[in-house]
């Protein structure tokens, strides 16, 4: 498991869904979101964790944030907003299933995101703690 390997894997999952994948922190994602139309994937690796027990270091785990988003219709068109949320939910759950098959995961937090970024986007976000 490497930093680039994880990014490449998310890129592969995005390609399987015919969605572009972009990497960056919160401020980069906000800036990029202004120019993106249609559905897409954001990925970030904001950190990791190393635990120790009485005998040795445990496996290093890394936190991976994946957002699957589309153009938000929040508070303007409920039907279109639900369509975006449904579409992106299907993609995020597919990615989650593939991630836990490929890596060991301590768990995942899935959060609905609506009307985020300056150019509003809605969809789903998953935070995975992955290790080998």
Where are the model-predicted features located?
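Charged, amphipathic alpha-helical segments and their flanking helix caps
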Residues: 1-26, 30-31, 45-132
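A short, hydrophobic beta-strand-centered structural micro-motif
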Residues: 35-47
């Amino acid at each position: 498991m490497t930093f680039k390997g994880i990014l490449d894997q998310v890129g592969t999952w995005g390609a399987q869904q015919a969605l572009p994948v972009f990497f960056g922190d919160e401020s980069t994602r906000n800036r990029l979101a202004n120019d993106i139309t249609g559905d897409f994937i954001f990925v970030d690796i904001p950190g990791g964790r190393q635990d120790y027990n009485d005998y040795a270091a445990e496996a290093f785990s890394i936190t991976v944030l994946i957002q699957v988003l589309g153009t938000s219709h929040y508070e303007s068109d409920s039907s279109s907003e639900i369509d975006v949320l449904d579409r992106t939910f299907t993609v995020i759950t597919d990615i989650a299933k593939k991630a836990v098959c490929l890596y060991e995961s301590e768990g995942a937090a899935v959060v609905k995101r609506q009307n985020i970024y300056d150019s509003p986007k809605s969809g789903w976000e998953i935070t995975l703690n992955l290790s080998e």
